[in-house]
């Protein structure tokens, strides 16, 4: 099976690509600039030479349709994050909403019956993790995409799963509003000081666990339009700092600022009746793996 991954050259895409390659899938990655992604996957997977790279714009229906030709499944990751959507909502909608419609339309055109796409824990407001009520443009765009996914199932029987990861952390997470915990791990590993720019509690989900969920979805013969909360472990930023200190007692990490605009009381749906998934990593296990990764990159090593 050949899988198209839109936006596959980024942080999460690299991890998903590795998981799919390790399971014998053919992978085609479409991204605006493939050079950074090539370097990332070369570092993480010995099968990196098997990836087919296509440069294209998710907001261009022509580019997406061309990239989807010959594929049997689509993993749609391409998009811009909260800060970019806040700074330019119209451009953000063009990429995040029209781009998602382009992915589903490409599936319809090429007879692809399943799309796994990235939604977000941001569909929930800051105080209620049970009922979607976003207070950011990014969250609003993601919620709109979930509605479109249901419409594609009703109108065209294109099945879908919208993954709602909360704060994804781990090796390689170095940009975005919620990258602070990963950057703190990197700083600790390199002997540097770092202040996480927010406080409060959030769902902390390790990137490998998220990638495994996407792989399970690609392998599954599910029907219907679904969403899954990938909440991980609810933890405060002080919990993150404590975990870092358990690995490196001398780490100079702290936190300061307002909490993230996302609820911390959502039900974790990682273990569900839809996909066969195992146990998630604990916060301490994930922090330890992240720190060890960055230690392995230090000049002394």
PLM segments and residue spans:
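NAD(P)H-binding glycine-rich loop region in Rossmannoid oxidoreductase-like domains
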Residues: 55-94
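Active-site helix of classical SDR
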Residues: 141-144
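Conserved Rossmann-fold NAD(P)-dependent oxidoreductase catalytic core, especially the SDR/UDP-sugar
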Residues: 76, 98-137
């Amino acid at each position: 099976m050949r899988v198209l991954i839109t936006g596959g050259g980024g942080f999460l895409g690299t991890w998903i690509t590795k998981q799919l390659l390790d399971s014998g899938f053919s992978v085609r990655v479409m991204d605006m600039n493939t050079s950074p992604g090539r370097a990332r996957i070369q570092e993480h997977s010995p099968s990196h030479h098997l990836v087919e790279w296509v440069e294209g714009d998710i907001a261009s229906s022509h580019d997406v349709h061309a990239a989807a030709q010959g594929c049997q499944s689509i993993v749609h990751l391409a998009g811009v994050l909260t800060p970019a959507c806040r700074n330019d909502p119209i451009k953000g909608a063009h990429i995040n909403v029209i781009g998602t419609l382009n992915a589903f339309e490409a599936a319809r055109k090429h007879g692809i019956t399943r799309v796994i796409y990235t939604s977000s824990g941001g569909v929930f407001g800051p105080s209620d993790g049970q009922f979607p009520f976003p207070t950011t443009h990014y969250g609003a765009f993601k919620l709109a995409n979930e509605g479109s996914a249901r419409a594609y199932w009703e109108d065209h029987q294109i099945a879908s799963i919208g993954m709602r990861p909360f704060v994804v952390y781990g090796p390689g997470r170095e940009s975005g509003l919620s990258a602070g915990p990963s950057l703190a791990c990197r700083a600790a590993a390199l002997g540097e000081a770092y202040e996480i720019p927010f406080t409060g509690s959030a769902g902390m989900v390790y990137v490998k666990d998220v990638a495994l969920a996407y792989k399970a979805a690609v392998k599954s013969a599910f029907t219907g339009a679904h969403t899954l909360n990938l909440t991980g472990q609810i933890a405060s930023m002080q919990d993150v700092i404590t975990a870092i200190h358990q690995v490196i007692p001398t780490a100079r990490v702290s936190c300061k600022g307002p909490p993230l605009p996302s609820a911390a009381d959502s039900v974790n749906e990682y273990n569900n009746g839809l996909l066969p998934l195992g146990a998630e990593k604990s916060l301490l296990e994930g922090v330890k793996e992240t720190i060890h990764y960055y230690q392995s990159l230090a000049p002394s090593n």
